[in-house]
């Protein structure tokens, strides 16, 4: 009798989990519904959970405000990635806010076919840079158009496991904080594109810089000695798209004590081939010192910039390497 009851309970439990699972097709449909609702400025047309929560660059906004009002259309580059295990979907590409075009990452969490979370990381032209002045951020629309993120389906026998993909992505953050590129699990010549600016590896479209810093020195493991980051806090890997071999890593770059640069909140996309990073794309912004970021659980690193990190330097800080120290 007890065995029969256990089997019945287990069967019902499996059925319940199956009913709640959102596969790739479900995630894609939900992501499309949300993006269409945002463009239409109509939260009611998206399947939002009653307790839905959204942040725009770390700031909580109510449905119908923030990006719900400002985004007028999606841009020419639109990429989508899905993680049925975590129940999350993401967008990497361009968005239009009136006459402005931005580089953006969007993360959605879906539970029981309802959107419970939305997180935007948006790079806008003319935004505040690491030095605290407007227009100091990396931004290159032409570079993003010329070097768009990949979309692909990797053969099953060539895919790294979910666990290995996360470890590969985390090795990049470990390499940055230890200032040792040999720790990073990456191919020689791995590339990096930040807010459309090519900052590491061979540049497939050097003319796209249009007079801006062309970057591309070394590769994604190079020039870390003077990288002005003491800690990458609040590391998260919400999207692990095993089918496309893509990982979304998110974190906060905290500067070395005495370095007068703002923190950096990043959405860093890792594209993996044969168990190593081949390409990186990132959208990012520089939060002011009083803004709690990333403003998502577990909230461990959601503090304003610590005073000891923001203190004026006793002596000039070492020169930062363009594209990493100066820009990130």
What are these regions (language model features)?
Residues 10-18:
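Hydrophobic h-region of N-terminal signal peptides that target proteins for export
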